[in-house]
């Protein structure tokens, strides 16, 4: 940076300017005399007070300004403090200001400043940022200059908002007095300055010049003009002091430094000119005022302190007089010194050589074409908003994911909002804070303005609230505190957000908060400590007078509603509303119209929950203080420090927030999973208009300035290029390199080229990497915990995560929640039996604590497993390690189909860290292969993303290999009899349980064989053979599949380290192990799809506009929607791709209370992009919340819980369905033991408060459910007889409907098509769903019997038929005659063992049960007498196949009774043309266990998580009438057993179906022979 800019004020106390040094920061006396170093010095005789006032003055505001003013600057560390010789005795900065820190005036940030010690917290890793951070967060600055310890926490006792001396009006009066004297003595100087400032502000204000194309510079430009205006106002008000001029200059220098460090644009020259002009304008008055305020006595104090400090700091050992002379500005040639010191401080950034290189660098980056739309591939829509939409995109070169906000230009022009778009761009570009979303670049297209930001995967807090209701206090406290830090940062730079709400608080994949959406923000004046007098706080609260009412109605502050002036306190009001919403579940003020809502905001009191639901006292106090109608009294008006001091945060470590483990960690199914977001397509329809040609020729000229590229993006880019230069240097071995990517574009050379990169190395060449200096440097830099800002490209970050975690696959213990993937070493001399395959805890069925990442499961493997002999000589541990490392790196490189040049490996020094700035994911890898890695890689096994925003995606929660994108299959052409590879089956245990599934790995590939030529690699996990998933198949089945395929077999593999399987010590209890088997699926994928479609829960969740799946938070209510495992598969326990089969969620929001709008466009349908890879709903995501569940589900507002009106803006047309209440689930890894929960969890449905936001559906059904909560609880209790619900305490859908028959209010007026399930079977036609008024029931539980064929009336309790043709609205069916029995079956889910009748308590059900058995038995055994019941022909039982049109195999032995007898499934004849009403008997599925024999099993106690090994019963085929009658299982009811209706009574777990019903009075044999 040009030195000549630095010190307009440098010689203020000198009678004349030394020639040529006007703008030079001489080590001048300019500060020497004015700083009250006394208070800041380390001298033991001079106590350091806690206020910015000089200690020796007693901090009395009544002291004369001559004594007072000069001392205050002691608390500002000026940018020039870098000149190490301590310009201005820079001890001033010793205990003090955070100007070197990230905020412009972090004097606000007290000893627990948010930015101050963030240098401990790596948050967006590129090494290029280390220098920046060290300066920005105060590390090198403090170390290299003489005020070395000045930012140490111990010496930062005070914060600006507590400065007593600044607030008292007496101090202001003295300032005014001094100004009066000054104006009297120097009238012309003052007048000239004011006139020049006025002209300057008018000429250069942002509205009168074209906006700068660079966002950082544009922001700085705005701040410079604001500072000029502030100076003008203060001068007119007589409030100017020397101190003020110091701080003004300090801020200008800081801004200029930011401009140089953070922008590569040529527009820096314009900003530099502005700063020069402003410094020249204020230089004369500043000098004069300084002379006027000079205090000789104070000056001697300063000299004394400086001398002491210089001696103590060993900065000046010999020549103290020369030091003092230099400080007095008496040296005429300061230049060499300045250059030398700047070199020392900033690493030489100002030396000419450095300038050359930086110029060269910036010119090369300028030569690069600016980013444009063509650089990004759009993956999918994330969410819609009022002005545009946000898309998930991937950069084509770096393969890094971003969120791209596309704003329709036409909309902006019509609404005159162009300036606002620039403001948003500038703020996002300038902001560098771990709690604020960062922007990478912006550009315009023909129709849109696009902003490319970091992608934060975890969705927003609004979706979280919508799905789980109120947050536990600890969770709310953490989210709130992180938002406070974001707000503190923004306010220090003069940014008022104006639209704070949970929707704009995004959750990173590490569970931390990032603030986003600055579309309504205002840029005001950055904080100045000299502005902290009472009048200014008032002025600050009325900073903007535009009288706009903007924001979201529920969060708008009273002063905005009343159209008074407003300022930063509006954000604190919104924070109060947010905290209330976090803790209570709904906002405090409601109204059906904005007017009504605003009326409440201005006049109403807050309603607080009472009794059990009451909030903690300190939380209530904090909310009340934030929701003060008067902005001057509101907490936070004096700065964020006031809020941070509140007792609610008593035990909070503000500096370590990013290190805290979050309770909610999003779990992504793939790198492209956006299911945590609500697309809001129902509210905003402009997406489709994007393709229309709606551009206008006369678009404003400033729009062309929108394109910009932030330093983050340039750094990511340059690091990519740097890396690409490193990769080709890696040595290659032709013998060991085998092609990994058969589909690589181009000829074999290209594939070979890829192999020549990091990935292609074989063992011999890999060993050098482990000890390479790059690696060591890399680890060291990571351990330093300093981090860069820009997020690294995926390839780089991931690749090094691979390179540096060799120990991961041998370490059985990991403390953090990255239960990561392990790669088996191919060659290894380690003891072969100590390998352990782990599955992340979320997938584990076994006991789990609430911490996500404890070692959970071990896999026992036979000696030698995973350890094929090495062909490369000595198979030492390090080599195995390097093999792993490079294999992993190679996979990362190739699996993204990237060429070496594009995704090179990272060079040393970069921190592997997710850019979400979450320090949690820093890795400190050990190169020792046997060490344990304390923090495993933040990379998800399944994600190839480089996303800065947070641990790219979470560890796979899948039993199956969990690959983010399967590579295309490797096709092996057999030559002769051999394919040329060996495969082996391995056991993979689920968590700590004894249940394992079978996986298959490529054990050995013959050199030169067909497999090697095709690119197959030893050690890879086989996922599919000929397109058929092989997970769960036993070895012979896989071999059979391969052999069936003739001369050509297509094998899909994935590198082992890319799976979620971990290797650990051998299993001791392997003799207890049970295999969770999965049948080979005989049918094609379309069969699977139709099977899935036929599942009840899929039908329910397909009601698009009523129930959108919001996978995000199904964590609290898991059910067994058998999304992936077929009911017919005896290995239901382990679906191929379902991550936690036993934790699959309910039809997501069906049990989530406030039927949530979809948080993902792809979340609810099986063939959506997000769910096609794994058809399951997200597993638990709220770790450790079980103890807090009772708080989570308390009613929203006690007395007034029923009056929660909806947001005035809500206009969703679709009424809500009577969705079941959210039922608390359990954290993942819930133990197998029975867990007891408070009875109220079982009986009364918890209330989820609706978020009164425009996203919510109309209110009546939900509200009425809220009102009738107690009634519902009673009815549930009575109906269910208190039975615990199995599987996460959930009611089956039919049960749920049944429970609520009496509640008219619970049923919506509209029914979506998805609710009518397909009717399968011959002659069946799909019934059309109708919309009718009045109370309705799902056909699954009420009138419309989906199982009755066309034309058949469904019998009703009264014996009357519904004239409408079989769909009745109200009356539940009652089976009172043998001809009208109807058994319902939950097609998609193994849940209830008992026969489900729609009658209430047991009497009718028992009658039904008895009446049901005889006809069936007689029919089955052929012994039915013709003299049976007169007029009642045999009742055929039709067991519906799960997939229409697909032949279903009779499964393998299904289960046995306690005696081990195998029982086939009943095969029941079908009467094609039954003369009468055909009745459908539907066999209820039950949980199966894979254990085929053993002691008599007791009925399973209700668990929160179902048994992992419980397979399902396949529905049998319809067989001809002549077929041999089937034998029902021996575990059917014995004579006289009477099932209780409505209760979840279960047959023994090995039972197959509750088909053994007894006709009234008829005995029922336990088992029937053929």
From Swiss-Prot:
Disulfide bonds: none annotated. Residues 23-80, 94-117, 139-171, 341-377, 717-911, 931-967, 1061-1186, 1202-1294, 1307-1570 are annotated as: Disordered. Both isoform 1 and isoform 2 appear to be restricted to the brain. Isoform 2 is strongly expressed in the neurons of the subventricular zone and granule cells of the olfactory bulb, Islands of Calleja, hippocampal dentate gyrus and cerebellum. Its cofactor is Mg(2+). The keyword Zinc does not apply. The active site is at 499 (proton acceptor). Residues 29-45, 66-80, 94-104, 1139-1148, 1228-1237 have a biased composition (Polar residues). ATP binds at residues 382-390, 405. Residues 376-649 form the Protein kinase domain. Residues 105-114, 151-170, 933-961, 1104-1132, 1149-1174 have a biased composition (Low complexity). Interacts with the microtubules. Part of a low affinity complex that associates with, but is distinct from, the postsynaptic density. Interacts with SNTB2. This is Microtubule-associated serine/threonine-protein kinase 1. The gene is Mast1.
